[in-house]
């Protein structure tokens, strides 16, 4: 699940199938993440607002969440479960392993918590153009090379409020199946946010 807000927050999440013992437990009781995500994108003005809400909400499942703040040029990765939540930046990013090294001023996660091949390939693609990564580079050389985003890929330029998005092929469509191999559309969210609602 992904989203972008008019307060220059970008958010993404992925379910965790390969947790380690640092995750804590899951529960069927709590606020479903779709509503957590909507609240954050609708009401949070800053990264701190979003993190505070996540810390206090009745969480349910294992997720990895990324939230970036275009106003502050910073981001956090969040280890999210019913009984535990942990917030990571570039200095304490987890899981810390040879296959998931830390990168100054960056947080990243590839496909799952314990997923060495995706994590390391993502690390390689980020560091190949470190400091010069553009949305176009991300689309052509990160998501497509790492092969992450079968169903959906969203790339945010939070400083310019531009969203690039691709979706996997529907059953009645032709062309590549995976979203990362398909055509991206570019949306100027400044225009979208300025639209007058009917």
Residue ranges of each PLM-predicted region?
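C-terminus-biased signal that marks the final domain/tail of proteins
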Residues: 41-198
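A contiguous strand-loop segment
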Residues: 1-34, 60-65, 132, 151, ...
């Amino acid at each position: 699940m992904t989203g972008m807000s008019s307060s220059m927050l970008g958010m993404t999440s992925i379910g965790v199938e390969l947790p380690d013992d640092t995750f804590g437990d899951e529960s069927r009781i709590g606020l479903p993440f779709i509503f957590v995500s909507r609240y954050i994108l609708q009401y949070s003005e800053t990264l701190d607002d979003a993190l505070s809400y996540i810390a206090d909400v009745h969480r349910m499942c294992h997720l990895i969440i990324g939230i970036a703040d275009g106003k502050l040029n910073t981001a956090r990765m969040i280890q999210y479960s019913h009984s535990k939540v942990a917030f990571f930046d570039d200095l304490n990013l987890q899981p810390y392993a040879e296959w998931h090294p830390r990168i100054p001023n960056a947080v990243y996660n590839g496909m799952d918590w314990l997923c060495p091949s995706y994590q390391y390939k993502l690390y390689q693609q980020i560091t190949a153009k470190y400091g010069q990564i553009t949305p176009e580079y991300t689309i052509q050389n990160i998501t497509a090379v790492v092969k992450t985003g079968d169903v959906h890929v969203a790339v945010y330029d939070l400083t310019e409020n531009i969203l690039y998005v691709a979706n996997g092929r529907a059953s009645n469509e032709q062309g590549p199946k995976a979203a990362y191999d398909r055509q991206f559309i570019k949306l100027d969210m400044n225009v979208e946010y300025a639209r007058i609602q009917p």
